Amino acid sequence: MLKPLGDRVIIEVVEKEEKTIGGIVLPDTAKEKPQQGKVVAVGTGRVTDEGKRIDLDVKENDLVIYSKYAGTEVKHDGKEYLIVRESDILAIVG
């Protein structure tokens, strides 16, 4: 499994099948980049200038919404993940 460092979070991207109003399924090339996913791992937190470690607000299994162009896409064990900084996460769903 991947282990993020510092204030980074690993997100498993949740992809929805997109259809037009007429019921046509859109190919991957025509889809918007997803902005929602499930947190699968969190780093140890960020360190302040004084050396104090601050825990992250998100936790494993949180469903989150993140910035559209955030992070680095990686493939691991056949699954697609996104590694983002916690500051790129906009909201926790639910």
From Swiss-Prot:
<comment type="similarity">
    <text>Belongs to the GroES chaperonin family.</text>
</comment>
<comment type="subunit">
    <text>Heptamer of 7 subunits arranged in a ring. Interacts with the chaperonin GroEL.</text>
</comment>
<dbReference type="GO" id="GO:0005524">
    <property type="term" value="F:ATP binding"/>
</dbReference>
<dbReference type="InterPro" id="IPR011032">
    <property type="entry name" value="GroES-like_sf"/>
</dbReference>
<dbReference type="Pfam" id="PF00166">
    <property type="entry name" value="Cpn10"/>
</dbReference>
<dbReference type="GO" id="GO:0044183">
    <property type="term" value="F:protein folding chaperone"/>
</dbReference>
<keyword id="KW-0963">Cytoplasm</keyword>
<dbReference type="InterPro" id="IPR020818">
    <property type="entry name" value="Chaperonin_GroES"/>
</dbReference>
<dbReference type="GO" id="GO:0046872">
    <property type="term" value="F:metal ion binding"/>
</dbReference>
<protein>
    <recommendedName>
        <fullName>Co-chaperonin GroES</fullName>
    </recommendedName>
</protein>
<dbReference type="GO" id="GO:0051085">
    <property type="term" value="P:chaperone cofactor-dependent protein refolding"/>
</dbReference>
<dbReference type="GO" id="GO:0005737">
    <property type="term" value="C:cytoplasm"/>
</dbReference>
<dbReference type="GO" id="GO:0051087">
    <property type="term" value="F:protein-folding chaperone binding"/>
</dbReference>
<keyword id="KW-0143">Chaperone</keyword>
<dbReference type="GO" id="GO:0051082">
    <property type="term" value="F:unfolded protein binding"/>
</dbReference>
<comment type="function">
    <text>Together with the chaperonin GroEL, plays an essential role in assisting protein folding. The GroEL-GroES system forms a nano-cage that allows encapsulation of the non-native substrate proteins and provides a physical environment optimized to promote and accelerate protein folding. GroES binds to the apical surface of the GroEL ring, thereby capping the opening of the GroEL channel.</text>
</comment>
<dbReference type="InterPro" id="IPR018369">
    <property type="entry name" value="Chaprnonin_Cpn10_CS"/>
</dbReference>
<dbReference type="InterPro" id="IPR037124">
    <property type="entry name" value="Chaperonin_GroES_sf"/>
</dbReference>
